[in-house]
Swiss-Prot record:
One of its GO terms (molecular function) is U3 snoRNA binding. Belongs to the UTP25 family. It is found in: Nucleus, Nucleolus. The lineage of its organism: Eukaryota, Fungi, Dikarya, Ascomycota, Pezizomycotina. It comes from Botryotinia fuckeliana (strain B05.10) (Noble rot fungus). This is U3 small nucleolar RNA-associated protein 25. The gene is UTP25. One of its GO terms (cellular component) is small-subunit processome. Residues 100-109 have a biased composition (Polar residues). Residues 11-40 have a biased composition (Gly residues). InterPro entries: P-loop_NTPase, UTP25, UTP25_C, UTP25_NTPase-like.
Length: 723
């Protein structure tokens, strides 16, 4: 299979969030320097093939001292205990006319001629294989539920409020202005965007793109001071006014974008504002679901009352029921979203809540308080990254584990949802439940980058495609822009991340085609180099590469010709060198070079990647601290998933700079600072050397600062020193 080792037989779409036979979060993202090594993606790199990846220094001590150094220190051992595909993207189908669409459903649903079963053995073998794959599925997530037809209720509306033309729900989805919509769709087809820039108080800068033409210009940002300024269902309005009478600066600036149905890329998410962002997005999602459902029920009632209902054209729904998709990194992040939603809805009943708690909630403290705050936010609780969950709303009840086609909101990790969809080469492929998604919320997108971003790309490529089956749809009620294959222009995408990356930027420009517009909110950076709290000589060396494709080879050639000689010239001086390598593919290349090149034969080295076993990690750290390893190779994803406290670091070499500026501070200030405190390094003697190219400009801005990045990328000199 292109994306893993198995497909999964599903007991109702939305089930099966179980484990898989492959491990290791992440994989190649399509390029030679993708995050992670092999395709697939879960866990923290356990279960990879093992081979020699170290060279010990020759010591004159006796065998007893050698055996003692093999054992990890008490500090390291305790930390170990506590830390314990090439995708063939489905082409987007050409626009179908309403008649052609109906004919395809009629053809698919027509009786099929009976065929003799000629190959019984083969079919039985396939059934056995499916059963074996089912055994590897998490039973707690299985859904045994029939797919329901369209909503037929005629009563039970949350509140029978009048349609408000000023409501963004009306203006964007229900009754958009035909003239404005037509004009903007034409601009979208031509790829024309008019830029508007505005300053958001205490937040950053918003660059808003509206389908149209014209020169970029500044505009005053809109703000909403409290929930009073939102068009909310009355029940939600009553609850949120009690919880949040007024908005903070972030909510005031972001609310107009979110509730105005514009696409949003927000790259300033952190542990301090995570709760506010979660509340705002969940409120918006539930408000959208309630308005959609109430409109359908209200129109059902109208049709039931009217004598001449054939004259009524009430287009109020999509092909399938699910309207909101939330892509999240872990089960714990799903728990936080669900808890926020229940606090806003205050349902009288919660069906299958105990089952949800048993499957998703883990109240044990997995990590000690010495782990960074952002690490504990991401990995606290149940950190399994293989899950999917359907949530269904009725008038008084929230139902967990509803079948996808019966759900209003789908929560999933990228891996969990991709396995639910299936693979194009497999017999069972189903993405019709994504055909009518109107809001996508991607929270902690930077964490998803450290898993396998190709799963996210795959999911976005399968959003809002016209369905292959009717699924009981009443086509007389389907909105015209669904039938015209324009749903992608109405979908709102919201991505929340701690920082911007080329992958997020690409998704923002290629997948965000919202006719309402899109906004990117970011801030300026003073630079992590100024936030170390430690005197360290920091040297940044620029390499010039012609293209991003040639960057890995140019970087390797620079490393072997300019940096390796400084280590081998006096191998004793190389002791305590930490070599940080962001990409797993680069890590493999450098590790093999250390293992096989005669040039590095005088250097002893160890290595820690996301696929290194805990026992091997402990040994590598112990040998590095004792001096048996001069050099320690260390990947960014290993640091992301474990945050090891490595001792004995006297010099840091960065083969490439990290995406996350927090990692820079933890490695440079944290590791070198610890060596100073423990007396292994004289104050002021620690050093850093980092290699970068113009393709690293986003990373470099966060590390060196917004004011310095352009000079470092464009100036003639290629070496920049900071103290």
């Amino acid at each position: 299979m292109a994306f893993g080792q198995r497909n999964t037989s599903r007991g109702g779409r939305g089930g099966g969030g179980g484990g898989s036979s492959f491990r290791g979060r992440g994989g190649s993202r399509g390029g030679p320097r993708g995050r992670g090594g092999m395709r697939g993606g879960r866990g923290r790199g356990r279960g990879r093939p093992v081979f020699d990846s170290a060279r010990l220094a020759q010591k004159e001590e006796d065998e007893e001292s050698d055996s003692e150094s093999e054992e990890p220190s008490q500090d390291e051992a305790s930390e170990e205990e506590s830390s314990d595909d090439d995708d063939d993207d489905e082409p987007v189908p050409a626009v179908k006319s309403y008649t052609a669409l109906m004919q395809s459903f009629t053809r698919d649903s027509a009786p099929q001629a009976k065929r003799r079963k000629l190959n019984v053995d083969k079919e039985e073998k396939e059934d056995e294989d499916a059963d074996l794959m089912d055994e590897d599925t998490n039973e707690a997530d299985l859904v045994e539920e029939e797919e329901e037809g369209p909503e037929t209720a005629t009563d039970g509306i949350l509140e029978d409020d009048e349609e408000d033309k000023a409501d963004p729900f009306e203006a964007h989805f229900a009754n958009p202005d035909d003239n404005i919509l037509s004009r903007r769709l034409q601009h979208l087809e031509k790829g024309q965007w008019a830029l508007r820039m505005s300053s958001l108080a205490k937040v950053g800068t918003a660059i808003t793109s509206i389908p149209g033409d014209g020169e970029p210009r500044a505009m005053k940002a809109m703000t909403i001071g409290s929930p009073e300024g939102l068009k909310l269902k009355q029940k939600l309005a009553n609850v949120i006014k009690k919880q949040r009478p007024t908005f903070d600066a972030l909510e005031k600036s972001i609310a107009p974008l979110v509730f105005g149905y514009q696409d949003l890329l927000f790259t300033e998410r952190n542990t301090s504002n995570a709760e506010s962002l979660r509340r705002l997005t969940c409120l918006h999602a539930v408000n959208h679901v309630f308005k959609t459902r109430d409109r359908v029920i209200k129109n059902n009632s109208r049709l039931a009352r009217e004598d001449s209902s054939d004259d009524l054209e009430l287009r109020d729904q999509g092909f399938t029921r699910p309207k909101v998709l939330m892509l999240l990194p872990t089960r714990e992040s799903c728990v936080r979203m669900v808890d926020m939603i229940t606090s806003l809805c205050e349902p009288e009943q919660q069906e299958n809540r105990k089952r949800f708690n048993d499957s998703f909630v883990d109240k044990e403290e997995n990590y000690s308080t010495d782990k960074p705050e952002d690490f504990r936010e991401l990995f606290a609780g149940n950190d399994d990254d293989m899950f999917r969950l359907g949530l269904k709303f009725t008038r008084k009840t929230i139902k967990y584990f509803s079948q996808f086609y019966n759900s209003d909101i789908i929560f999933a990790s990228p891996l969990g949802l991709r396995m639910a969809i299936g693979d194009e080469d497999a017999k069972k492929v189903d993405h019709d439940f994504l055909s009518s998604i109107e809001i996508v919320i991607v929270d902690q997108a930077d964490a998803l980058l450290m898993q396998n971003w190709e799963h996210v790309e795959f999911i976005f490529d399968h959003l809002n495609l016209q369905p292959k089956e009717a699924h009981g749809c009443d086509f007389s009620r389907v909105r015209s822009w669904y039938l015209d294959n324009n749903a992608k222009y109405f979908r709102q995408n919201i991505a929340l991340a701690g920082f911007n990356t080329p992958e997020l930027q690409t998704m923002f420009y290629t997948q965000s085609q919202n006719w309402e517009g899109k906004a990117k909110v970011s801030s300026t950076y003073p630079g992590a180099i100024q936030e170390l709290g430690l005197k360290v000589k920091q040297t940044f060396s620029r390499i010039d590469t012609e293209s991003i494709a040639s960057d890995p080879q140019s970087r390797f050639e620079y490393f072997t010709s300019a940096i390796i000689p400084t280590l081998t010239r006096r191998s004793k001086d190389s002791s305590g060198t930490l070599l940080f390598i962001p990409s797993y593919m680069d890590f493999v290349k450098v590790r093999n070079y250390f293992s096989t090149s005669a040039t590095t034969s005088s250097l002893s080295f160890g290595s820690i990647s996301e696929y290194t076993t805990p026992k091997e990690v402990a040994r590598a750290r112990s040998h590095f601290f004792s001096g048996r390893h001069n050099v320690l190779l260390y990947t960014e994803r290993a640091h992301h998933f474990r945050r090891y406290q490595i001792r004995g670091v006297k010099k840091v070499i960065m083969y490439g700079i990290p995406e996350n500026p927090i990692f820079y501070k933890e490695i440079v200030a944290g590791y070198l600072g610890r060596s100073v405190r423990e007396g292994d390094l004289e104050p002021g003697n620690g050093s850093l050397r980092a290699v970068f190219s113009k393709w690293d400009s986003m990373k470099l801005e966060r590390i060196a600062g917004t004011e310095r990045v352009n000079k470092m990328i464009k100036e003639k000199g290629d070496t920049f020193d900071f103290l």
